[in-house]
Amino acid sequence: MPVQSAFINWKQEPDEYLEAILGKGRAEKLNPLGTFVRNGIIISDGSDAPCTTPNPIAWIDKAVNHPVHGEAISVQDALRMCTYNGYYASFDEDKRGSLEVGKFADMVILSENPYEVEKTDLKNIKVEQLLLQGLPYRSCRENIFKAALRGLHSRDA
């Protein structure tokens, strides 16, 4: 199931606005990531850019630090939601989404290990390098989103 964890605590839609329209109880149920995971639903994250951030690090932070009790997910589930599950949802998991022999080696090198930082510091992790098919793709500081799009478009390469 595709989700957009960027909408959790989305600054353009204050909680009070959503609560006024939906009521507090229903507003809190808009992104029940923990409920989905506990029930075995495979979730993949994405973005409505430019309406929400296209930054997967922000999505992981929002999913792990979900403000509603019981709806936060583990770092492992959040990483899987942003990697393998996305390719599973698009029927491309046999080629991408995990590091295995025979698959494209598309990956990022992060400034810190998401499993070792405090959950509240996940948002501070930076992408240091992007690799497409195992090869470095310029400096990520130049234009990581253009590089990521190029990687997505090279599906059949």
Regions found by a protein language model. Give the residues of each.
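Glycine- and charge-enriched low-complexity intrinsically disordered segments
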Residues: 137-152
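His/Asp/Glu-enriched, well-ordered alpha-helical/loop segment
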Residues: 1-116, 120, 125-133
